[in-house]
Amino acid sequence: MLNGQKEYRVEKDFLGEKQIEADVYYGIQTLRASENFPITGYKIHEEMINALAIVKKAAALANMDVKRLYEGIGQAIVQAADEILEGKWHDQFIVDPIQGGAGTSMNMNANEVIGNRALEIMGHKKGDYIHLSPNTHVNMSQSTNDVFPTAIHISTLKLLEKLLKTMEDMHSVFKQKAQEFDSVIKMGRTHLQDAVPIRLGQEFEAYSRVLERDIKRIKQSRQHLYEVNMGATAVGTGLNADPEYIKQVVKHLADISGLPLVGADHLVDATQNTDAYTEVSASLKVCMMNMSKIANDLRLMASGPRAGLAEISLPARQPGSSIMPGKVNPVMAELINQIAFQVIGNDNTICLASEAGQLELNVMEPVLVFNLLQSISIMNNGFRSFTDNCLKGIEANEKRMKQYVEKSAGVITAVNPHLGYEAAARIAREAIMTGQSVRDLCLQHDVLTEEELDIILNPYEMTKPGIAGKELLEK
């Protein structure tokens, strides 16, 4: 059928009929969904598209295993799914990721694209559903309520693999920086006030340790994602799914995805509850909370360059101002802060969406997976950019840090065991009021000798457990 300059085909469902552009692979249900949900302007995440193709391929293979699906139809479905996994036809997934219907629109988008491509493979025209139907054949033994959660599990696990690799690389650079800066002494601060000396390497080692815990937490959070509810069909009872099909489809899912997937031991539970996603999201939130704190530290230590702390230098990535010539901003650290705000907000959305489930199904999974996959993706992209464009190039301004240590009254803490708290406090106060150093005041008041102060006020020794100048107390 021609309509103006375009050629169309007509498809029907129980609500009526619609004209579909003849060359597209999606069908009437996808078109209805795209008209109903023009929400975000975003596309379905490519890992979610691939995960849906994996599910459809596994289901076709399992249905052929149990002789429910004719071999010719099944192999055409498998080939169409493989083409999607090769990167083809992704532009045919047009429904908005945020949608009503618990993911039915996304599932039908996959069914129709795979179905119409399979029809072509079999030598038929798109939309000629008498030979192969998106619902009857591509969706055989399935419901959106097991297809969609299973695809969420697979896509999330795939993205987490990439994120964890990026985090391991970032952790390695933090460890390298900790070693590089191990001999660099700086002033430690609590309440943003001078405390006692610390090594810059110790601070970076602390960053590497918290990141190490985050990696471990995220790895552990994947545990329940390996359990899928494929075979649950509508409410977890497995209606219309052959028991042997259920066994085979999980086996094929594991083989195709390369993931150690297993069938959930209670399909009703696995169909109605979404705590596996909130567990992952919580670990991402904690990670970004920690990374944002690190970014705050880096921004503060790099403040200046003339009128701030200027203890470290961050790589200059771009001009920082449209009005102030020469200004450079800590844009990569600021990036981490903003990713943290987004991930923390996404986690709140995921919690609310998980709580909103009712009875046998959580219909809010579309907004849940949209935010979960976004969190993982922006963390992966952000960490990679931060590592390459900032972390690797951080330099220590040793001269500046040495000056701060020498000028600070905080080193009086090392003198405390030798003079007593009250006497040490008087010297500290005088140092703050007069601007003189603790060393000069101790000599001025004749409370310690030059040689004793060399031992007690050795800044490197102050960064290790013990009492500075302990041997002097034992005389």
UniProtKB/Swiss-Prot annotation:
One GO-annotated biological process of the protein: tricarboxylic acid cycle
Record-linked Gene3D superfamilies: Fumarase/aspartase (C-terminal domain), Fumarase/aspartase (Central domain), Fumarase/aspartase (N-terminal domain)
EC top class, as a word: lyase
Induction (free text): Part of the ans operon, which contains ansA, encoding L-asparaginase, and ansB. Contains two transcription start sites, depending on the growth medium.
Sequence positions that bind L-aspartate: 104, 143-145, 190-191, 322, 327
Any one Gene Ontology molecular-function term assigned to this protein's record: aspartate ammonia-lyase activity
Catalytic activity: L-aspartate = fumarate + NH4(+)
Documented EC number(s): 4.3.1.1
Keywords: Lyase
Record family assignment: Belongs to the class-II fumarase/aspartase family. Aspartase subfamily.
Protein name: Aspartate ammonia-lyase
